[in-house]
Amino acid sequence: MPATAEAADAATQATDAFSTKLEENKLPEGQERGPEEEEDDDDDETPAPGDAEKKKKKKKKSGAKKKKSKTAKAVMEQTEPPSIGLTKMFPNGVFPVGEVQQYDETKFDESRKRVTGEELRERERLIQEKDGFNYNFIRRAAEVHRQVRQYAQRTIKPGMSMTEIANMIEDGTRALVEVNGFESGIGFPTGLSLNEVAAHYTPNAGDKRILQSGDVLKVDFGVQVKGRIVDSAFTMNFEPTYDPLLAAVRAATNTGVKEAGIDARLGEVGAAIQEVMESHEFEAEGKTHQVKCIRNLQGHDIAPYRIHGGKSVPIVAVPNLDVKMEEGETFAIETFGSTGRGYVVDSGECSHYARQANPPHVSLRINSARQLLYTINKNFGSLPFCRRYLDRLGEQNYLLGLRHLVSQGVVQDYPPLADVPGCMTAQFEHTILLRPTCKEVVSRGDDY
């Protein structure tokens, strides 16, 4: 779910006052934490940066016993459509590790270059102890995303309605994540943006739109476990005309993932993305198209229970943007390409909303607004939602109250974002975790 330039500024201001333990989202006292990270076999074998040579010289202690590690192993196959919860498939509570990439150590600050591998592994343990975080939370969310999206890729066909597609993805997500209030559930509404619409479209009640064979469909959905959100997106087309557009955007996203890392400057990441994206051009319908970055859409960091944490990752060069990525942060690296002008504006009926992380204290004069805010706090907190989710909860005649919450700054609306009519847009996105010892692309799969 992308950040616009305007939304990024607002998120940055909110971050200054943000506490990861929002009262609305507080987990029950006494809740048990998941398995400790050192039980994950894959991670134990991940060398810390600069540690490989030391390992070669280190002598193995005679008679030393290695602690037996748990591995991520599914004990059953998933159904079609997906319906088996992940905790039943992985009963030991250990979920598949994402793609591990080593950092480019030349980008590290001097202070970090002096840190030993042992110290980095200790930091990794400490990060997981903070607020009860465990890497298996976000890995569980990522495995849900992989299984649901791969079924969606096999199933989505022209002739299906947008509502049918959204329900299929969200029903699968709810089943596999074993939805349980703020403990686990949907991370944000399923985006199904078509053609020139790049982001933030999901069908409202009564939407009759049908997927056509010539459409370019962006599928963007999120999964959360204990507030750790996996945000990942892909694009589908059903005719080969715009295959080169999809290839350009996918390559740009992979470039962003490669360039990201501890101490990486966000402006430099954006410049690398733009260079790759805009090196592509192709012929379609008798015209030559240079792929353009949609310059006012950006990637972003992800905070607990907040899809936009406060930092934005541009997809174009931004001179003098020296903000750095930091150890322990989670980022959504997403890029958007267009055959249009490379700039989006609000377009069409709004469906996406989110309560502000730190809403202002205002007097709500409309009764329906007060009631609706209670429903939002109880069911979503600061997580994004859509009108269909309110319908599902039995809310009725809520539009006046919803508009009042938006006008008072309590709720932020996210209208569909579109480039010029007639153009095509594409999106690919991955969630990455900047661990002390390595970069983990948690949402990576065989599909993208």
From Swiss-Prot:
Family in the record: Belongs to the peptidase M24A family. Methionine aminopeptidase eukaryotic type 2 subfamily.
GO BP annotation list: proteolysis
Start-end of Basic residues biased regions: 55-71
Biased composition (Low complexity): 1-17
Enzyme Commission number(s) of this protein: 3.4.11.18
Protein name, as recorded: Methionine aminopeptidase 2
One term of GO molecular function: initiator methionyl aminopeptidase activity
Bilayer-spanning residue ranges: none
Compositionally biased residues, Acidic residues: 35-46
Amino-acid positions noted as binding substrate in the UniProt annotation, renumbered to this chain: H200, H308
Chief subcellular location: cytoplasm
Residues that coordinate or bind a divalent metal cation 1: D220, D231, E429
Pfam families named among the record's database cross-references: Peptidase_M24
UniProt feature, compositional bias: Basic and acidic residues: 21-34
The keyword Hydrolase is assigned to this record: yes
Residues the record lists as binding a divalent metal cation 2: D231, H300, E334, E429
Catalytic activity line of the entry: Release of N-terminal amino acids, preferentially methionine, from peptides and arylamides
Organism: Malassezia globosa (strain ATCC MYA-4612 / CBS 7966)
Keywords for this protein: Aminopeptidase, Cytoplasm, Hydrolase, Metal-binding, Protease
Domain of life: Eukaryota
Main function: Cotranslationally removes the N-terminal methionine from nascent proteins. The N-terminal methionine is often cleaved when the second residue in the primary sequence is small and uncharged (Met-Ala-, Cys, Gly, Pro, Ser, Thr, or Val).
Cofactor: Co(2+); Zn(2+); Mn(2+); Fe(2+)
Localization per Swiss-Prot or TrEMBL: Cytoplasm
